[in-house]
A protein has these predicted regions:
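Terminal low-complexity "docking" segments
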Residues: 1-177, 181-252
Length: 252
């Protein structure tokens, strides 16, 4: 498979400026008590997501007197966990695309990651958070992660494609299934000003592509990583490799 120059990490290791160290880079919120939706039979206005997730997934920036950019909600879903996901998405009115492309997208479409722009009051969005015995009650499948972004699906897709494959400390390519919440959270938890490599998952100093990421852990809690900002003076690390801390986190 041919690798495009902009497909993989080229700007991973950074050193933050000193004054930036006084500001929080990432805010981490653990959302406890998230209860999945039930069938909501007889409910006039059924909920789209659990109450606890309404603001994290569909809330908008506070009105500061200026026109704030709208935050969109994206899910990156594992087709191996949802039977017939490509066909299911084709029958929705939601924007979506496969993170793989070319031959890989065709041959692996039923096991590939798919990005979909979620909308409120949408049946598919609701299904992701509904627990039940039906074939489209998808809560128990825990199929992916959720992102908030001010950018289009095409922009977010192009950015996330860079992270399907990473280099370890020996320069070897590794597949990174970041659409599985537990390994992604382990990776994002390694952010620090000493080793802020995973800030690149959110974007660059010039362009913040991902404002927040929500993942679900083994205990059923949701964890929200919110990127406040990316330092505007960063030094590139030409090696573009995972730090030892990140390797240990992903191996756990």
């Amino acid at each position: 498979m041919q690798i495009d120059d902009d497909d993989w990490w080229t700007d991973l290791g950074h050193k933050a400026r000193k004054d930036f160290g006084r500001k929080p880079v990432i805010e981490i919120d653990v959302l406890e008590g998230v209860e999945p939706l039930d069938a909501q039979f007889g409910v006039t206005l059924p909920r789209t997501v659990p109450v606890t997730l309404q603001e994290p997934l569909f809330g908008q920036p506070a009105d500061s007197g200026q026109d704030p950019d709208v935050l969109y909600t994206y899910a990156v879903l594992d087709a191996a966990k949802i039977l017939g996901l490509p066909e299911l998405l084709e029958n929705t009115d939601l924007d979506h695309d496969c993170l793989f492309q070319g031959t890989a997208a065709e041959e692996l479409r039923h096991a590939a990651p798919w990005i979909v722009k979620l909308e409120e009051n949408n049946r598919f969005t609701r299904a992701l958070f509904t627990k039940g015995s039906g074939p489209r009650d998808l809560w128990d499948s825990d199929p992916g992660i959720f992102c908030r972004s001010k950018h289009t699906l095409d922009d977010v897709r192009k950015h996330l494609r860079k992270f399907t494959k990473v280099r370890d400390g020996h320069g070897r390519w590794l597949y990174f299934r970041f659409w599985e919440g537990v390994p992604l959270r382990a990776y994002l938890d390694t952010v620090s000003l000493e080793h802020p490599a995973s800030l690149s998952f959110y974007g660059t100093a010039e362009r913040l592509l991902i404002d927040a990421v929500l993942t679900r852990d083994y205990a059923g809690r949701f964890v929200k990583h919110h990127c406040q900002a990316i330092p505007d003076t960063l030094e590139s690390n030409a090696s573009g490799r995972l730090t030892s801390v990140q390797e240990q986190a992903l191996a756990t």
